[in-house]
Amino acid sequence: MERTKAIVIIAGGPSLTKEDVEYVEKQDVDILGINDAYRICSRLTYLYACDRRWWNWHWTRVSELPCKKFALEDMDGRIGVEQMENDGFDGLSFEWPKLRTGKNSGYQAINLAILLGYKKLILLGYDMQHNNGKVHWFGDHPKTLNNAPLKVFKAWLGFYDTMPVPEDVEIINATRETALTCFPRKPLEELF
């Protein structure tokens, strides 16, 4: 189903600010939060997290959120989390419920938004780099969860560079500080 609204995808990069999120929340857009985005955004339309370990750690805080939830790893039948399927690393999937992974949740969220029918995707918090020693806007994940080292970000960028974005889909990177240069960049204030 094609969506007429734009969707803002909120990742966890260290340049993400509460002010940017509050600005987005006032716009007529849908919002797809990745992982801990629920902690900074109170108006999620969707929540996506790949890893079962993340869901286990956060379940008591996210289980009652009114947004639609998606995961890539098996969720052991958790009610309210739709299970997506891993369809490989590179490219994009156009078959529901399969996702190409790009080996990171940000890439998977883009594929999910396209599968959901969105034609205008706005990226926020897609730093794809460390910033002043930080990996995420909230600091590090707990030790039992993943915190990507810098070399991993560099490897992930290659998947984005070769992402075959359909001609009728527009992806704009509104991230304040980013190493992701394959999509046009614009500040939020120029988009709304």
PLM regions: where:
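Metal-ion/cofactor- or nucleotide/acyl-coenzyme-handling active-site neighborhoods
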Residues: 1-192
